[in-house]
């Protein structure tokens, strides 16, 4: 069986990482080989991005270029080979984050999408987690003690508005204020209904 690409999106603090790892563990435990991964990566371009989030020395256009370069490498060297080997990829952030985050900084959203056309792998399912902005910021502060420059209330409100506008049939909007198990169960039920994976063993 060829693998699948399942994407988790949403603002920082919405719980994507925890849900992604939980989902990956459940799939592996029922015999569906799965890998959790994330963007930006810790490879060259992703590391440059992580540095810039603290130093504030890149323009939105420069940030976008690094995100796309990192994503190209991620797809080429990790995501595509794993999918071809039959793995389910559970991906924390993808091109939709670039559209939302850089779009909220004024870069045309269609332009951002078009920059991906030549290399992107279309996801099988996208789950967009929505959470009250103040709750998300409080979670971030509790977890690491600071917020980076992508993480202020007004900006994240604009980002979430763009996330809320995504309405392709394979995209599903999730209330991330619920407990993690409830969120994961909702995602698993949607995967089961979509029939992209054999989840009949799940009750």
From Swiss-Prot:
Biological role: Phosphorylation of dTMP to form dTDP in both de novo and salvage pathways of dTTP synthesis.
Protein origin, superkingdom: Bacteria
MF (Gene Ontology): ATP binding; dTMP kinase activity
GO cellular component: cytoplasm
Enzyme kind, highest EC tier: transferase
NCBIfam families given in the database record: DTMP_kinase
Protein name: Thymidylate kinase
């Amino acid at each position: 069986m060829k693998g699948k690409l399942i994407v988790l999106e949403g603002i920082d603090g919405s719980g994507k990482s925890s849900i992604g790892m939980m989902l990956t563990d459940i799939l592996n435990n029922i015999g569906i080989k799965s890998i959790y991964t994330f963007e930006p990566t810790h490879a060259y371009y992703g590391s440059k991005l992580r540095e810039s989030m603290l130093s504030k020395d890149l323009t939105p256009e420069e940030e976008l270029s690094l995100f796309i370069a990192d994503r190209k490498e991620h797809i080429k060297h990790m995501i595509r080979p794993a999918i071809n080997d039959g793995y389910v990829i559970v991906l924390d952030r993808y091109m939709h984050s670039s559209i939302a985050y850089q779009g909220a900084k004024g870069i045309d959203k269609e332009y951002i999408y078009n920059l991906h056309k030549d290399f992107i792998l279309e996801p099988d399912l996208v789950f967009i987690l929505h959470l009250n902005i103040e709750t998300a910021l409080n979670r971030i502060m509790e977890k690491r003690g600071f917020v980076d420059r992508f993480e202020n209330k007004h900006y994240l409100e604009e980002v979430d508005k763009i996330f809320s506008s995504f309405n392709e049939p394979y995209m599903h909007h999730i209330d991330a204020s619920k407990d993690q198990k409830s969120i994961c169960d909702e995602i698993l039920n949607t995967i089961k209904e979509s029939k992209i994976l054999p989840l009949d063993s799940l009750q």
